[in-house]
Amino acid sequence: YYVIAYINCSAHVKALSDCICTSGNAVKIVEFAPKDRPILFVPDQNLGSWVMERTGRKMDLWQGSCYVHVEYTRESILKIREEHPDAELISHPECTYAVRMLSDEVCSTEKMIDYARNSNSNDLIIATENGMLHRLKKEVPEKNFIPAPTQNCACSECHFMKMNTLEKLRDCLDNLDPQIEM
């Protein structure tokens, strides 16, 4: 296999992979992957499925997913769209196929900013980790960003992403610690 790993996976998985991708460059990475080798895409099956839809390239997908993005459901999205009929829905490719099919745009977090900036709609429903809403509001303040609800609440926050702080980054650079051995 030619193993392509999503950037959000562990350092150990990255070390065993041939190539690392982001949601923003995954399509290009797959397009340039060796044609004579089968691809194993890890660890997010929804992102991998979206990449296959975009590229037409068959891949074997690891059966993993982001616990935040799979909480968005067809039902929760239909409900919020009913409440905001003029709003556009932007979702991250880690969302399930059912949510992606209901979306006006499926794109990486970086591309969400450009899409929001250029959208004719003033109201945008965002189906990704809630931390992105702060950035969108800061970069495109003239738009109204509505958090997409999960089945149970609108609290789609990733505690893993919140573990990284500026202080921890500073300390890591100052002390070269913690060190990870593989």
Report the location of each language-model feature:
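The feature marks the mature, well-folded catalytic cores of soluble enzymes
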Residues: 1-182
